[in-house]
């Protein structure tokens, strides 16, 4: 039996033009974006991955499929050595996902054109370690948030455009009262308010944030913590000034001044609420050192509900968290909370022992 010569698959074939390589890179990246969109990822997540890939490509200077483990060693060990851990982890994950896509979809085509075998340059030896922790957000105190909304409410009497200002005020009040995410609030429709449900009425959050590709998660949020009064005032006294038909299907709860092509009110964007809240906080909370964002108000809501006696399971359901460990990161207690809990425990123990024979 004769032996056949085995050709090394890593040897490049006939060279291709730069235009061919550029076209292949464009097609592959477009396919990557489309595949991630088909998997249900948000536009922001896909754009973030593409940005990471473009930055690696700009440093490497060649198609990404030419990267080898020594190249990844140099990039993550030297170029990104002093960058934030979250940046290194996100960039490494984007690169691993991209190479997984190349191996599944384009391994044969890339080898046929360039002679290279696609292999991920990130392995167990150079993979950035650690996990990305959420940024700690300490909310203002209840007195400070009360002062913020009290001053904001007084501005409504003298503002130039009452309806948009009252809408922004109402939306931010909702974030602080029942812990809605800003995107969830923007996507609410007027019929999502279910006045007849429960003791206080409920809010049908149809576009809750999902996790691990689950898609939007719906939930019912009770209008506790004065949220029902806030919404009732807005719907009865403010909403009609935007000139939309309340019987129209899909009419937004928080309409914009801008109109759609058919003359109906469009939906407000989250940047409008972010800028309005930042402006109000800068005016009425000048002593607060950090930026007050909608997510900070969400942390404030969780902390106040916990201090008011609501258990963590109920807060988890209100905020729409998949894991109670996430809810625990949202609860910020005062510095004397441990001492107060110890004293309360001693008082309960003394009450149980009272009356027993000595």
Positions of PLM-derived features:
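Short, basic (Lys/Arg/His-rich) helix/loop patches that form interaction surfaces
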Residues: 157-160, 274-317
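C-terminal secondary-structure termini that scaffold catalytic or DNA-interacting sites
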Residues: 1-19, 345-358
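Conserved tyrosine-mediated DNA breakage-rejoining catalytic core shared by Y-recombinases
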Residues: 187-231, 237-240, 332
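Basic, Lys/Arg- and aromatic-enriched nucleic-acid-binding interface segment
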Residues: 147-182, 248
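Flexible interdomain linker/hinge and immediately adjacent N-terminus
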Residues: 7-14, 77, 108-152, 209-212, ...
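N-terminal core-binding DNA-recognition domain of tyrosine recombinases/integrases
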Residues: 30-135, 155-160
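Active-site/catalytic core of tyrosine-dependent DNA strand-transfer enzymes
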Residues: 224-288
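Catalytic-site neighborhood detector that most strongly recognizes the C-terminal catalytic loop/helix
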Residues: 319, 323-344
């Amino acid at each position: 039996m004769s032996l056949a010569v085995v050709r090394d698959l890593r040897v490049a074939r006939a060279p291709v033009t730069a235009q061919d390589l550029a076209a292949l890179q464009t097609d592959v990246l477009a396919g990557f974006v489309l595949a991630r969109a088909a998997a249900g990822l948000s536009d922001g997540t896909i754009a973030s991955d593409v940005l990471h890939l473009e930055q690696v490509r700009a440093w490497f200077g060649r198609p990404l499929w030419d990267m080898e483990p020594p190249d990844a060693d140099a990039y993550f060990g030297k170029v990104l050595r002093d960058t934030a851990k979250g940046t290194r982890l996100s960039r490494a994950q984007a690169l691993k996902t991209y190479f997984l896509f190349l191996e599944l979809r384009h391994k044969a085509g890339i080898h046929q054109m360039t002679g290279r075998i696609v292999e991920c340059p990130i392995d167990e030896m150079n993979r950035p370690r650690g996990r990305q922790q959420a940024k700690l957000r300490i909310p203002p105190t209840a007195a400070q948030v009360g002062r913020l909304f009290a001053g904001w409410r007084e501005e409504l009497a003298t503002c130039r455009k009452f309806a948009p200002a009252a809408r922004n005020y109402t939306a931010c009040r909702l974030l602080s009262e029942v812990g809605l995410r800003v995107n969830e609030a923007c996507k609410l429709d007027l019929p999502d308010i279910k006045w007849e449900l429960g003791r206080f009425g409920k809010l049908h959050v149809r576009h809750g944030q999902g996790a691990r590709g689950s898609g939007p998660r719906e939930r019912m949020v009770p209008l506790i913590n004065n949220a029902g009064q806030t919404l009732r005032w807005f719907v009865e006294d403010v909403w009609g000034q935007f000139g939309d038909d309340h019987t129209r299907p899909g009419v937004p709860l928080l309409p914009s001044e801008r109109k759609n092509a058919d003359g109906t009110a469009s939906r407000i964007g989250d940047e409008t609420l972010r800028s309005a809240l930042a402006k109000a906080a800068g005016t009425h909370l000048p002593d607060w050192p950090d930026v007050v964002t909608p997510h900070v108000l969400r942390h404030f809501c969780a902390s106040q509900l916990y201090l008011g006696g609501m258990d963590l399971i109920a807060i988890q359901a209100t905020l729409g968290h998949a894991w109670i460990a996430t809810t625990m990161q949202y609860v910020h207690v005062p510095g004397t909370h441990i001492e107060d809990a110890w004293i309360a425990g001693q008082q309960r123990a003394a009450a149980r022992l009272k009356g027993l024979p000595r």
